[in-house]
Amino acid sequence: MYLDLDVILAELKADDWLASDVDLDAIEEPKTSVATGIELQYVMEDEWDRDRVVRAHQEIASKNIELVPLTSDALDAAADLRAQYTALNVFDGVHLGSAAVLDEPIISTDTLFPEIPEVEHLDPRDLE
């Protein structure tokens, strides 16, 4: 299952609003794109110290979340989705495109994702 950034943040931030609702053990073969490591650095740059920010991808991997490569196929899928759904930002497109190419559902609380039928969406709060 492909994890969006909100699920990653729930695992890495003790005070995250979603932390008590995410159970990585309930997620089969969790994975995310290396782009999530970049997005995590961008989002946490003002909150974490620099040493932690620059190694954000290592924190993801330390949670036994597989970091999958960002491929040109995933970028093509992202481009197709962003062309069709103008509300998708760059990272939304990359995450959905990666999940689509991997043929994995995306685990996210993003309220836009259920409107994208090309990729199965699961809310982490609904997993047991």
Where are these regions (language model features)?
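Histidine- and aromatic-rich ligand-binding microenvironments
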Residues: 2-4, 32-34, 88-89, 110, ...
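Acidic catalytic patch
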Residues: 64-84
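Short loop->beta-strand "edge-of-pocket" segments that line small-molecule binding or catalytic clefts
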Residues: 29-31, 63-64, 105
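A generic structural signal for short hydrophobic patches within well-formed alpha-helices
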Residues: 8-9, 37, 113-114
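Short, well-structured N-terminal submotif of metal-dependent ribonuclease cores
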Residues: 1-32, 45-58
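Conserved glycosyltransferase catalytic-site signature
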Residues: 5, 72, 91-93
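Acidic, PIN/NYN-like endoribonuclease modules and their adjacent C-terminal/linker elements
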Residues: 66-67, 96, 100-128
